[in-house]
Amino acid sequence: MLDKNLLLVDIGGTNIRYAYSNIGDLSFVSENKAELESLNDFDNLISELLANSVVKNIVFSVAGPRVNNSIKMTNRNFQIDADAIRKRFNLESCHLLNDWESIGYSIKTFSENDFDDFKESEPFNENFLVIGPGTGLGASVISGNNVIATEIGNTNLGLPALKSLLKINSDEFNAVSYTHLTLPTKRIV
């Protein structure tokens, strides 16, 4: 039996990833990734992930806007409700975060060398914007210890500037979600 008390689940637009840890611990075990073809058997998946562990706490990171502790995904017919999951699986806690909200909270675990800035400047406060491509375009705003979740999604807003920055000259791309980007950096800030 796995002795970890926390299950972390990331449900993105394309893949689902999960790992086990303990609350307050930055290390993970049993990290897994699978293509996200269907979430029809979501309850069965969670049951299987909880079966051989002492997990009583789950944190979900899901692509989509969070409203009233629930997220309806932007690119598929799936909705997740943290309160219902906590009750259904008899959990102590079940937290639901927008995917880029999760990234925003994780930023302080990285060092300055892990980031590339779009524009060099002298910092004058603790606010910054984190953006990045995935199935859609994601972003979060960080102000001190607070993270403001966003949902840009599949959009062409700002696409000319992004294509210019990344030196993409083709008119073939008319939405960020159609662009697969490989960048020589670990993070974009």
Regions found by a protein language model. Give the residues of each.
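Short beta-strand-loop/turn "lid" adjacent to the catalytic site in phosphate-handling enzymes
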Residues: 52-96, 101-114, 130
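Short glycine-rich, Thr/Ser-proximal phosphate-binding strand/loop in the N-terminal lobe
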Residues: 2-45, 147, 152-153
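A glycine- and small-aliphatic-rich helix-loop capping segment at beta-alpha/alpha-beta transitions
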Residues: 23, 76-79, 110-118, 144-149
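Short coil/turn connectors at secondary-structure junctions
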Residues: 3-4, 91-92, 124-128
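Glycine-rich phosphate-binding loop of actin/hexokinase-like ATP-binding domains
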Residues: 120, 124-174
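Conserved small/polar residues in nucleotide/adenosyl-binding loops
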Residues: 179-185
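Ser/Thr-glycine-rich phosphate-binding loops at phosphate-binding pockets of nucleotides
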Residues: 14-16, 136-137, 179
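A polyampholytic, Gly/Pro-enriched intrinsically disordered region
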Residues: 102, 113-122, 173-177
